[in-house]
Amino acid sequence: MNNARPIHRALLSVSDKTGIVEFAKALAERGVELLSTGGTARLLAEQGLTVTEVSDYTGFPEMMDGRVKTLHPKVHGGILGRRGQDDAVMNTHGIQPIDMVVVNLYPFAQTVANPNCTLADAVENIDIGGPTMVRSAAKNHKDVAIVVNAHDYDRVIREMDANHNSLTLATRFDLAIAAFEHTAAYDGMIANYFGTLVPSYGDNKEGDEESKFPRTFNAQFIKKQDMRYGENSHQAAAFYVEANPQEASVATARQIQGKALSYNNIADTDAALECVKEFSEPACVIVKHANPCGVALGDDLLQAYNRAYQTDPTSAFGGIIAFNRELDGETARAIIERQFVEVIIAPKVSQAAIDIVAAKQNVRLLECGEWQGQTTGFDLKRVNGGLLVQDRDQGMVAQDDLQVVSTRQPSDAELKDALFCWKVAKYVKSNAIVYAKGDMTIGIGAGQMSRVYSAKIAGIKAADEGLEVAGSVMASDAFFPFRDGIDAAAEAGITCVIQPGGSMRDQEVIDAANEHGMAMIFTGMRHFRH
């Protein structure tokens, strides 16, 4: 049995009125009696629907500027009453069963997002009656349907039509889960907002400013897919996304073809896409194990790809390729004919490219949409027993921010390459060293415990691929603690170094650059990446 329950009476009270008129009309056409409150009732009545105001049903008026509307036994008794068990009590008190509750909540998130929002504004947008009805209906899903999302309206009507105006228990249970998720997210937003208005635990000094981070951290993500396994085959995994991601990303991407994305695919694709977003010129980023192994600019995507691949063809095998322009057929053909690739992602993919990549059905081809800058937010990192939370690293220097600390000034070409490889270094695991020349990476040294060894690896990789390091620019994601890194760079033929500065031995490092006739640029900004 599907334990279907017929829908005879529905209570509608929504802040977001998207689709509510059409939904209410569909319910009315199917003989459902409509109860409603406030603005929702007025809207439905204006559209010619017969609606009973909740205040008329309860015999108790709305009061306190609408703060008290539905908090009444005739409402909650009708929702919570167990059919076949509480019928006598309901009849004694004149409580009619309510079979469906359609509620969404005051727009708290939109209210507090307004920079001019006051505490009083926030308080008045904390919904009380709405969450109470939602939770009541979800608790009694055995008998009552709760609808909190407008995108479920059509689904509900279709099922009613297929089941003689009834909804199955499976559907009511699914709607109840969505309802509890809805109220959990809502309460989490409120707790986060109020939690930022006071100092964090342990910092209760008088006069402390508001905290950027709430006392408790509440976040909600929606499962997009289950995975075969996680980072390793013995780990279970799933991919969760924000409810409404605002920025084009791997989370918003549409998969055009290919096998299901793996855990590592998603992590690597994110690294590649976020790096390529840094560039305004046609760019290609190739990533392996979350590190760029080749990055280049070009007059078009084909040139950018060819140059990025040239940096490290060995590591590019089985890599992730990201572009910041529409993927064209010529570039797609060059990739497919040249190398094995796991994922290709671009803001848009041409039909010609789709047709070409289709020859390799296992290649995952993603279209993420155009991006308009970066959205603010937090980066999260799990540690045993805790969670590290920080701002996203959206910092990036412009030419005017740079400080030349060497005797020799960088040439225009060196300056351009310095800014290019500084952007790349931001996305390389620390300790990060990037060699670049002519808008392409020459060698990349990543993830070494010693900065000097990262530099050596960058040089070895360049030599292995027959690339000339002499005349290149070197970027370091953090300062040089000793001059040995500069001496090694000079020996390799590096002519310009860009780094944050800030070491106690900065002068020693600058002196080394001057001795070798190198230009040295300080950014004043570090880009550790762990």
Swiss-Prot record:
GO terms for biological process: 'de novo' IMP biosynthetic process. GO terms for molecular function: IMP cyclohydrolase activity; phosphoribosylaminoimidazolecarboxamide formyltransferase activity. Residues 1-148 form the MGS-like domain. It holds the Pfam family AICARFT_IMPCHas. Its EC number is 2.1.2.3, 3.5.4.10. The keyword Iron-sulfur does not apply. Disulfide bonds: none annotated. It catalyses: (6R)-10-formyltetrahydrofolate + 5-amino-1-(5-phospho-beta-D-ribosyl)imidazole-4-carboxamide = 5-formamido-1-(5-phospho-D-ribosyl)imidazole-4-carboxamide + (6S)-5,6,7,8-tetrahydrofolate; IMP + H2O = 5-formamido-1-(5-phospho-D-ribosyl)imidazole-4-carboxamide. SUPFAM superfamilies: Cytidine deaminase-like, Methylglyoxal synthase-like. Transmembrane segments: none annotated. Gene3D superfamilies: 3.40.140.20, Methylglyoxal synthase-like domain. One of its GO terms (cellular component) is cytosol. Keywords: Hydrolase, Multifunctional enzyme, Purine biosynthesis, Transferase. It comes from the Bacteria. Pathway: Purine metabolism; IMP biosynthesis via de novo pathway; 5-formamido-1-(5-phospho-D-ribosyl)imidazole-4-carboxamide from 5-amino-1-(5-phospho-D-ribosyl)imidazole-4-carboxamide (10-formyl THF route): step 1/1; Purine metabolism; IMP biosynthesis via de novo pathway; IMP from 5-formamido-1-(5-phospho-D-ribosyl)imidazole-4-carboxamide: step 1/1. NCBIfam families: PRK00881.1, purH. The IMP cyclohydrolase activity resides in the N-terminal region. Belongs to the PurH family. This is Bifunctional purine biosynthesis protein PurH. It comes from Vibrio cholerae serotype O1 (strain ATCC 39315 / El Tor Inaba N16961). The lineage of its organism: Bacteria, Pseudomonadati, Pseudomonadota, Gammaproteobacteria, Vibrionales.
